[in-house]
Amino acid sequence: MRKWSIEDSEELYNITGWGTSYFGINDKGHVVVTPRRDGVAVDLKELVDELQLRDVAAPTLVRFPDILDNRIEKMSSCFKQAAEEYGYKAENFIIYPIKVNQMRPVVEEIISHGKKFNLGLEAGSKPELHAVIAVNTDSDSLIVCNGYKDESYIELALLAQKMGKRIFLVVEKMNELKLIAKMAKQLNVQPNIGIRIKLASSGSGKWEESGGDASKFGLTSSELLEALDFMESKGLKDCLKLIHFHIGSQVTKIRRIKTALREASQFYVQLHAMGFKVEFVYIGGGLGVDYDGTRSSNSEGSVNYSIQEYVNDSISTLVDVSDKNGIPHPNIITESGRALTAHHSVLIFEVLETATLPEWDDEEVIAPDAHELVQELYGIWDSLNQNKMLEAWHDAQQIREEALDLFSHGIVDLKTRAQIERLYWSITREINQIAEGLKHAPDEFRGLSKLLADKYFCNFSLFQSLPDSWAIDQIFPIMPIQRLDEKPDRSATLQDITCDSDGKIANFISTRNVAHYLPVHSLKKTEPYYVAVFLVGAYQEILGDMHNLFGDTNAVHVSVNEKGYNIEQIIDGETVAEVLDYVQYNPKKLVRTLETWVTKSVKEGKISLEEGKEFLSNYRSGLYGYTYLE
């Protein structure tokens, strides 16, 4: 038999598909990250080992700021190429919506590297606006204000504009326009107004319904005309600088984007014809990420286009319609959150233990006085072959059901039930092995692989670190970071350490459609086994919750240079005391309460003084320890 190779693992986990040259496998069989194309590769297994020496335990979120920089450069170069190809004569701007990942180090890295690429920020709420105004110190950088707005939100934005910030207030509802007009008059400011238009066009994929007629935000054509009349009556006609549309996140089909662009471009033309000299067309989110590496519109976790194609269509559509109507090319703003941030973060956790369905030991002999159902089932297993497997499967199911029924009525004992159980699952395994080798296996056998998968219990919380996996069945690339020069010998689902049955991952990227198990290796007693989840830089950190009071994981920032990699920053995960404080438990008060109780227990002779001290010491150290298993 041919020896398993690294190339086999690359194909099995499709790392060349979703990795987009950032992720690969080295000669040691370890996953490597190459933040800069053709640059230094970071060995994730060696990185985890080094972090262990620094007392940074898994689970750990590893951020690669250089990937953020590379994504910004990629977007900018695509615009530059498209502008040259289609004769685009205006400016393009990239906007990062901080809702995608509001973590300060992420936002600051994007701002820092994005200065020379016309990169600005979008705020979708009052708290986000407070952050954006303070961290975005470049006066030439755009700030776009979306979301619901009250007077204090609008006043903050207008005063910031008055002091030199390049801020646009995007009207989502008609009442916001009236508030803007009122506050602008009070503050003596000529506001930069944008209007979000509700297109008939919608996106595709999981977020299809967030666009189109049923979308939450935006003005209809009738409301737009009302808004235009209002602005003209209030002397704000020249303040309308921008139109905005959004057809949904993670649009899987480029045709939907093309359709929306054509529709939106006509609004730009019509507004110019009515005397509103709009300068910016703000294309909302939608630029997707190929999570499964299939480049297919049939998968909600993929897209059938590249960044370059997305940009080409955006520029060519608006250039064409502008030239035909003799109006200036608009400045184009593209909102890119997922496409900028997804690749830069990797979650790594350790497998703690496994659970496998029982099986019959080949050397185990059936006792002469064994229950007749056990003997019958053993006979089925002993004589199983391809020709008989469908009949054997039906018989095995019937015998198992009969045995369970008899056990429930107290007729068969526990030992008999256990024997039936082991024989049944052994038969199921053998049937599955035979069926997997058949070109046309019976439909009844299709779900057996999923049924037989091991459970790998992992030191992480799905709800904290991968909320989209639980909430919307988002599929992320997942694979071991080591032993990839060995053939995986087990199939498993991943279980987290919360006490919730939903805390599991049972859908994985496969070479064909979606797999219900992950190929993994048997655990070794002397070697920790690590699994990584990739492309988690968008939304996951900020949406994560504290189910079972599991807090933020440890996080590290890793940069690369000519000589290798450097761990720039280590951010400790939350302690037990910190998460308890979130839910209004005072850690100091908890300790005092326990001290009183322990003192009472010692006086009553329930425990010794030393035991009391040991208990309190453990409690105090646990309070200020990691929320995950150590």
Language-model-detected regions and their locations in the chain:
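Flexible, glycine/charged-enriched surface loops at secondary-structure junctions
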Residues: 58, 62, 84-89, 274-278, ...
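Short alpha-helical segments and helix-capping/turn motifs at coil-helix boundaries
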Residues: 7-9, 73-81, 104-109, 129-130, ...
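Charged (often Lys/Glu-rich) extended helix/loop segments that serve as interaction or gating elements
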Residues: 305, 313-315, 319-630
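Active-site-proximal beta-alpha core segment in soluble small-molecule metabolic enzymes
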Residues: 87-282, 287-289, 293, 304-309, ...
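Charged, compositionally biased N-terminal leader segments and the immediate start
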Residues: 1-31
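Short, glycine-/Ser/Thr-/acidic-enriched flexible segments
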Residues: 30, 38, 67, 101-103, ...
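Low-complexity, highly charged intrinsically disordered N-terminal segments
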Residues: 20, 25-102
